[in-house]
Amino acid sequence: MRAPFSRTLIDLICEQSERYPQQPAVIDERGSWTYPQLRDRCLELASALRAAGIGRGDQVGLLVNNRAEWIEICVAVSALGAVAAPFSTWSTPRELDFLLRDSAARILITLDRLGERDYAAEFSSLFADTDRRPPALEQLVVVGESCPVGGKAYETWLASAPAFELPPPGERARPDDTAFILYTSGSTAHPKAVPNIHGAVIENGFHIGERQGLSPVDRVMLPVPLFWSYGAANAMCATFSHGSTLVLQGRFEPGPALDLIERHRCTSIYTLPAITHALISHPDFAPARTRSLRTAMTIGTPQDVATVAQVLGAREVCNVYGQTESYGNCCVTWHHWPLERRMAVQGPPLPGVRLRVIDPESGRELQAGEVGAIEVSGYLTPGYIGASATQNAEAFTADRYFRTGDLGSLTPEGDLIFKARTSEMIKRAGINVAPADIEDVLRQHPSVAAAGVTSAPDPLKGEIIVAYIVPARDTQATPESLRSHCRALAAAYKTPDRF
């Protein structure tokens, strides 16, 4: 289909509002919003942000799960030339402190609570303590029913905003401005800050949607977090650039996910091997419940791809390869290819992407069939920022290729075949985990003198986390105490599976 003309998120939503005035843009577990309704909400929020002093180049912290507010916040900031900085809702207070300081967010928009986490109480305490509060952070806005002293209730805040008209192009975001900063786990103890640029993320997202065969009739199910590039840079931009509908699940649970797919007749799903397994293993799963699925996006082994097509029922599933630095995906198979080909390769580079495989020792570019280090250029982050900016020289070549840390080869047809990871990263159930991060947490346990973390293959999760420790003198560390310690200081998915 024809690509949209717009190259910023706010302009894209405004354009699609004119093209598809009756089309739902977002559905979450509470309701549905058409493209014009989403546009109006974004402009209302932009007015509130401007009244709060937010302008060009300012960072807006975002701690919200998959719901319509996440989308409208991410889009609205671009009306002012500001930048969204989404944070993982799995982050511990210690990790959030780093994210707030590194992003220099001037305002934080957060959920009141999610599961057992009471974010409102956590941030109320933080704002009351000027010694602990990050220096750039000035304001707190809370999404939900409870709002602490010192914070502003999101809906009340929006309702009190003055009337707002979209600023002229020179005042709002430009195509070469940063749309959002995504934090991704890396080989260092802290996550890396990865800017994604408006024009590039929309263009790359459009090409991803083309590989899936998306159109305005499609409804795209998203059970994975929007704060991942797989969600924000990939699913959101692929969906909105095609006038399709994004169906959000606030927190993945297989039973409710099956309900959403069936109720809204979703035609595409962004999945991972662990999610696929959870869906098809659920006692309420039946092929009839997912018969609306046509296509999907997944990573994994050839069998993982086949399972999505043949068991889950998304017969035109796309096999993919990419990372946050390349806007979610840089290679995607075509949905209409024979399944055997989609199982065997991760597809050709997307338009505008250049990919090469080199000998990691000599730097020589390799021929088809030769296995070497994968490097990517084209639609690519301009570089890490914040504390991780020191990693740029190591991560990017002089001619602006990104060193992915992966091994692979190219077929004579130009398709990428991913072989293995060369970096130290552990990919547990599709989530990147840095060993250094876990080692740092383990070393803070009073019974640990030294710690090392590695991975082991696992048929369900791909890799699991294995930790080795040297006990401190005259102490005894039990696996139970170590797990409790890790869960207290780091997100739950970083807790080692085996000691």
Question: Where are the regions a protein language model picked out?
Answer:
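Conserved AMP-binding/adenylate-forming core of the ANL superfamily
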Residues: 2-6, 10, 14, 22-67, ...
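Conserved pre-ATP/AMP-binding loop-to-beta segment of ANL
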Residues: 22, 141-142, 152, 159-183, ...
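Conserved AMP-binding A3 loop
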Residues: 34-36, 172, 179-203
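Structural core segment of the AMP-binding/adenylate-forming
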Residues: 51-52, 82-156, 473-475
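A short helix-loop-beta submotif of the ANL/AMP-binding
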Residues: 58-59, 65-85, 89-93, 98, ...
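AMP-binding/adenylate-forming catalytic core of the ANL superfamily
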Residues: 91-98, 108-110, 355, 373-378, ...
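Gly/Ser/Thr-rich phosphate-binding loop
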Residues: 158-159, 263-271, 280-343, 354
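Conserved AMP-binding/adenylation subdomain of ANL enzymes
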Residues: 202-219, 227-268, 278, 282
